[in-house]
């Protein structure tokens, strides 16, 4: 009736950590993000820290926090724990992730201790990656969370009032928590799970540096956008200009006009949609804004999703 479930050695799939596993993990960073409840975006592979190289430098799009990922194809060891802390300090990381085949109990305890002793802005995660097969099936991978922050304990240890969130910040956090929960549970739009006390939230497009965003601007407007924010100005303007060449096609598909914001005085560019809305609106008005944000984000993704990747690939080679 049932097949036999078998674990596969990681080295059968990825013989070499640096040349096989790290590139695969970088390419599948979104899957790791799902296991952690984050939208992770790759920043750099083999990022230099003095004479050493971090496996993966990334960003949590929901909070813009820096993320470091150190991985190994074997059980955790003291050498990699030392590297993990060195890289965390070198990049001033807020989110520290250790991926391995197995996590020794003393190393899990070390991660728990670090989570208990650090502030609410710093989080340490231990993640086990496993590969499984059923009989002679194709191998499948799975990420299992082995160590993570105890948010209740971190909240308890938070210093007040210096560490407290403003009333408006709490409103933003509650709004975006509701928004991302809806987008995740009902539309599979994001893996994010934690709202932030800020007036914006970004979501992965699948191309590093290009994101979908939901925002509240200072002019009493709510905005849904495609944000083109690579580190290179020329590449951003190229992507924007190429999209603008098919403006009529894009706007016809969306069913409305877009605000085309090249932002010539800045590095980034964006395509935006606006409606009236403020975080200080009534609960019923904010529900309407949330419904608008969801509708427009889904439309932007369905209209622009297939167009972004080819332009991103060309821009990368420029």
Tell where the protein language model's regions lie, with residue ranges.
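Charged, terminal alpha-helix-loop-beta segments
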Residues: 1-318
């Amino acid at each position: 009736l049932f097949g036999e479930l078998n674990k596969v050695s990681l080295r059968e799939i990825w013989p070499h950590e640096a040349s096989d596993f790290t590139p695969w993990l970088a390419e599948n960073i979104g899957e790791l993000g799902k296991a952690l409840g984050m939208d992770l975006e790759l920043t750099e592979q083999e990022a230099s820290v003095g004479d050493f190289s971090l496996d993966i430098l990334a960003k949590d799009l929901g909070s813009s926090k820096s993320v470091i990922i150190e991985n190994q194809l074997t059980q955790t060891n003291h050498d990699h724990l030392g590297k993990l802390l060195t890289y965390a300090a070198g990049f001033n990381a807020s989110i520290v992730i250790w991926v391995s085949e197995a996590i020794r109990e003393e190393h899990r305890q070390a991660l728990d201790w670090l989570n208990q002793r650090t502030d609410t802005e710093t989080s340490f995660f231990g993640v086990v990656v496993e590969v499984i097969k059923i009989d002679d099936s194709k191998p499948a991978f799975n990420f299992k969370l082995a160590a993570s922050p105890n948010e209740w304990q971190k909240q308890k240890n938070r210093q007040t009032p210096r560490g407290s969130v403003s009333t408006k910040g709490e409103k933003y956090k509650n709004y975006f928590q509701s928004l991302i929960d809806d987008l995740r549970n009902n539309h599979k739009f994001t893996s994010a799970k934690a709202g932030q006390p800020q007036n914006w939230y970004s979501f992965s497009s699948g191309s590093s540096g290009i994101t979908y965003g939901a925002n509240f601007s200072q002019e009493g407007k709510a905005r849904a956008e495609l944000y083109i924010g690579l580190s290179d100005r020329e590449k951003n303007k190229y992507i924007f200009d190429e999209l603008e060449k098919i403006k009529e096609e894009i706007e016809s598909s969306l069913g409305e006009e877009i605000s085309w914001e090249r932002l010539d005085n800045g590095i980034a560019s964006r395509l935006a949609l606006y409606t009236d809305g403020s975080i200080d609106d009534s609960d019923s008005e904010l529900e309407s804004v949330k419904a608008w944000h969801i509708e427009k984000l889904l439309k932007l993704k369905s209209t622009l999703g297939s167009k972004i990747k080819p332009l991103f690939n060309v821009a990368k080679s420029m």
